[in-house]
């Protein structure tokens, strides 16, 4: 009896970061062909919002932006896959080829399982956090119980996280170490404009509203921080209206240092 061959499905993950699978790579390839996120979304069968969110997640996940949207990109303008994006596409293709070879070993009766294991791996776990931001540690201040970790996100944007001293030590946090900062969207407060005034939240990221999605009760706001980085907040619909939040409006994301979770690549 002829059996259907097994198909290799590759996905890449880093600690605490969302999974990047073949569907996201296909989206990047489609953007490269069409030059727009809207055209790519139609080709791969995604809604425009889903495709836009996927691009934002990818840009936040990697050190260099994978896609650059020209002015007006949110409403159908041009988009360009960067050299880093092209390198990811090419590298993913090479890994898929290696995975297919390893799969052939498995189908052949696992006569050399160690060979397959050298080709199959996972770069770790999933996360449900809406915001996963790649950062570099700039300073660590250790206390008796807690540690304050300062992080560089982009030029002009920095974060502060407060974690346990034990966690900071076990993770080997020191200046120059790369980490992922995870912040739940519901933990992010928003203030209209660039100066929120006196407030206890030490993390303040000012940007421009890139997208607003309204639900019956809550509203999702995506704030463009520049350099292809973004942060998402979920606030009440009433609050979004009161603040006058709409695409193109400046706003500031606010959140506590204790609400930042750190994960290692």
UniProtKB/Swiss-Prot annotation:
An individual GO BP term: molybdate ion transport
Record has Methyltransferase as a keyword: no
SUPFAM superfamilies reported in the protein's UniProt record: MOP-like, Winged helix' DNA-binding domain
Location of the Mop domain: 126-192, 198-264
Keywords: Molybdenum, Repeat, Transport
GO molecular-function terms, A-Z: DNA-binding transcription factor activity; identical protein binding; molybdenum ion binding
Superkingdom field: Bacteria
PANTHER family hit by this protein: DNA-BINDING TRANSCRIPTIONAL DUAL REGULATOR MODE, TRANSCRIPTIONAL REGULATOR MODE
Family classification: Belongs to the ModE family.
Protein name: Molybdenum-pterin-binding protein MopA
Protein's organism: Rhodobacter capsulatus (Rhodopseudomonas capsulata)
Gene that encodes it: mopA
């Amino acid at each position: 009896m002829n059996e259907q061959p097994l198909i290799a499905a590759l996905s890449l993950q880093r600690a605490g970061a969302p999974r990047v699978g073949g569907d996201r790579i296909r989206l990047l390839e489609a953007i490269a062909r069409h030059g727009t996120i809207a055209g790519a979304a139609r080709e791969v069968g995604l809604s425009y919002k889903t495709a836009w969110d996927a691009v934002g997640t990818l840009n936040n996940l990697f050190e260099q932006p994978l896609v650059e949207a020209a002015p007006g990109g949110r409403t159908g303008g041009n988009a360009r896959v960067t050299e880093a994006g092209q390198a990811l596409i090419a590298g993913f293709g090479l890994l898929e080829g290696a995975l297919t070879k390893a799969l052939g070993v498995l189908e052949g009766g696992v006569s050399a399982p160690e060979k397959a294991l050298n080709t199959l791996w996972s770069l770790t776990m999933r996360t449900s956090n809406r915001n996963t931001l790649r950062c570099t540690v700039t300073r660590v201040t250790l206390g008796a119980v807690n540690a304050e970790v300062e992080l560089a996100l982009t030029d002009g944007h920095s974060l502060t996280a407060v974690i346990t001293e034990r966690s900071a030590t076990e993770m080997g946090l020191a200046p120059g170490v790369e980490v992922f900062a995870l912040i739940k969207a519901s933990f992010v407060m928003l203030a209209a404009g660039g100066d929120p005034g006196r407030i206890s939240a030490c993390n303040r990221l000012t940007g421009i509203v890139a997208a607003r999605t309204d639900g019956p009760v809550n509203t999702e706001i995506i704030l463009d921080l520049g350099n292809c980085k973004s942060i998402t907040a979920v606030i009440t619909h009433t609050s979004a209206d009161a603040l006058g939040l709409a695409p193109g409006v400046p706003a500031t994301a606010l959140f506590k240092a204790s609400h930042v979770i750190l994960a290692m690549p």
